Amino acid sequence: MPERLAETLLDLWTPLIILWITLPSFVYMAPMNQAHVLTTGSPLELSRQSEEMRILNRSKRGWVWNQMFVLEEFSGPEPILVGRLHTDLDPGSKKIKYILSGDGAGTIFQINDITGDIHAIKRLDREEKAEYTLTAQAVDWETNKPLEPPSEFIIKVQDINDNAPEFLNGPYHATVPEMSILGTSVTNVTATDADDPVYGNSAKLVYSILEGQPYFSIEPETAIIKTALPNMDREAKEEYLVVIQAKDMGGHSGGLSGTTTLTVTLTDVNDNPPKFAQSLYHFSVPEDVVLGTAIGRVKANDQDIGENAQSSYDIIDGDGTALFEITSDAQAQDGVIRLRKPLDFETKKSYTLKVEAANIHIDPRFSGRGPFKDTATVKIVVEDADEPPVFSSPTYLLEVHENAALNSVIGQVTARDPDITSSPIRFSIDRHTDLERQFNINADDGKITLATPLDRELSVWHNISIIATEIRNHSQISRVPVAIKVLDVNDNAPEFASEYEAFLCENGKPGQVIQTVSAMDKDDPKNGHFFLYSLLPEMVNNPNFTIKKNEDNSLSILAKHNGFNRQKQEVYLLPIVISDSGNPPLSSTSTLTIRVCGCSNDGVVQSCNVEPYVLPIGLSMGALIAILACIILLLVIVVLFVTLRRHKNEPLIIKDDEDVRENIIRYDDEGGGEEDTEAFDIATLQNPDGINGFLPRKDIKPDLQFMPRQGLAPVPNGVDVDEFINVRLHEADNDPTAPPYDSIQIYGYEGRGSVAGSLSSLESTTSDSDQNFDYLSDWGPRFKRLGELYSVGESDKET
């Protein structure tokens, strides 16, 4: 009760204090306290010094100061009086002038230069500027000479409660875990007040909650927000809106206030166990489904979110634990049941599983709420499907000897239809795996037989694929790999491992090893190779060489004596019989060539006679000489024939089947000849119509331009063409009517559109069958011979 009375009295006195501050009568204080009055002592004494300069000589300081105050935001009809300047040197004769300078002098503060009164002519705001520093000085009214040194003073702006609190960082967001205990700190907020925190209670703030109760509370002075209720459940309500108020003047009436909002979100904790939506699930699956296929999904719902809702799924019981598995889908938060092993409808038609869902992240604070897991039953029904045949073995390994008879049985494969309605099976070989068709199979019983002979030395293994097909449904097929190993038999005789050539020194010693040889066998006996070496029966008593078997299955050839002479015999041939240990044993004879060479004293071969080179075909030197002689003789005959052919005179008589157009005829033409198509053409000038290259056809007979004379009779067929041309040339040269060589001669123009076309051999590109020369008979007797020639060529061609 006393505290409430004190607050009431404070609320009543606050307006009175503000009014007392603003009264002008209190701004100017009485001279006894010298609050806002400046006074001076004795008058200014003036004295003269050298150079007639006057200086001020003050007996005592005349200014007395206190700070001046002015209330902010004051807006009256008249400028507010801040204070008054006064000096003791002012007797009231109005001969002293007061000057004010500094912050705001002349713009904010104005002084009466006679009375020294200072007024604020503008509205002041403490939040913009809290104090002003000015300089005061008293000068002579007439001379403006200072009577006292300048002095500084401060005018402070007194604060009033004109600013409301503000939340600069609002609105706010905060989180707090659900199920938190009472008084759990959520966050804290801060408001600011621009008023003076030192003077009065204008900046003293008190916080309160306007909205958000009874869930949250706030401490009035620190603004810390706490939970006001325990065990708030996120699943019931996840988000809360809290309205917070900050009020100045200590929260009393008349104070200014500001508000902000705080959004509080409850974060999730694992306080809920998973729960299956149903206790029994039914799924069906065909028996031929591929391993790893998803059969179905089960899901346990959890009201929590994030990692608190994550659950792991397991199969904990049932008769199909070996055939099925369950995996957790973290994205969908469910369990996926997949096939682990093949199913067989004929063996078992249904399975029962018991699955469990358990939270992964457990919060021990809520373990008392029970186990965070749940179980459900899954019923899986297997559906019948038409399955492909099943072989009795996934792979087959067969063995056969390489000398096995054709059509002999190598082995057998078996397969069955696993369905209830069993279908007969037919077998076949995938020929892509048996391109050479070395094997066959019985389509009914699956027996594999040999089709072509085998050779282990060519291929030891044969891998084929057998196909089993249902007769009732050809789309149901199965394949099985069959590996056939070819077993070895002794069918190859041993022989030298390489071609050997031994060298024997003439000065060699008896018992000296000439050469060491080894043998090889393409067969592969189980116990390895063991070779027997011997000489031919007729070479057993060989006087020159002997053999010795070594422990490493090789053979050494030794000399029996010394004194070999390459002049007497240069090469020795030693046949060696090599036998294997097979059943039956096989043998072969290999010949070792031994050359006698000249050697140094230390046994180094220096020279050996070279054996005459023998052609691979076995021809002797005499046969070679005979062959070369025959070739040279043939070449001589050919050269003689060509030479005689060149000197032979061939007749120039035109044969009946010869075409005269195939002969090149020379003309003595003016100008550039036939090739000169750009030369001067008098016929073109005489016929302007032919300028464009198209002349009208004129069928006229040639006119005689010379005196009549007796000519020779037409030349009969078969006459010599050379003689005929020479006669005609002689007549032309001796013709007195012929024009001179330097005159312009006019020839019959045969241009484009002429029936005859060009008579040049170079332009005769068409075949004889495409041309008709019957019109030549209409040109007169002088062209009769030409017509006969062409007519003869055409008739001969037809015959």
Curated annotation (Swiss-Prot):
Keywords: Calcium, Cell adhesion, Cell membrane, Cleavage on pair of basic residues, Glycoprotein, Membrane, Metal-binding, Phosphoprotein, Repeat, Signal, Transmembrane, Transmembrane helix. Residues 643-799 are cytoplasmic. InterPro entries: Cadherin, Cadherin-like_dom, Cadherin-like_sf, Cadherin_CS, Cadherin_Y-type_LIR, Catenin-bd_sf. The chain crosses the membrane at residues 622-642. GO terms for biological process: adherens junction organization; calcium-dependent cell-cell adhesion via plasma membrane cell adhesion molecules; cell migration; cell morphogenesis; cell-cell adhesion; cell-cell adhesion mediated by cadherin; cell-cell junction assembly; chemical synaptic transmission. It is found in: Cell membrane. The keyword rRNA-binding does not apply. One of its GO terms (molecular function) is cadherin binding. It holds the Pfam family CADH_Y-type_LIR. Glycans are attached at N188, N463, N473, N544. Gene3D superfamilies: Cadherins (2.60.40.60), TCF3-CBD (Catenin binding domain) (4.10.900.10). Residues 62-167, 168-276, 277-391, 392-494, 495-616 form the Cadherin domain. One of its GO terms (cellular component) is synaptic cleft. It comes from the Eukaryota. CDD domains: Cadherin_repeat. Residues 1-29 form the signal peptide. The modification Phosphoserine is found at S795. Three calcium ions are usually bound at the interface of each cadherin domain and rigidify the connections, imparting a strong curvature to the full-length ectodomain. Cadherins are calcium-dependent cell adhesion proteins. They preferentially interact with themselves in a homophilic manner in connecting cells; cadherins may thus contribute to the sorting of heterogeneous cell types. This is Cadherin-8. It comes from Rattus norvegicus (Rat).
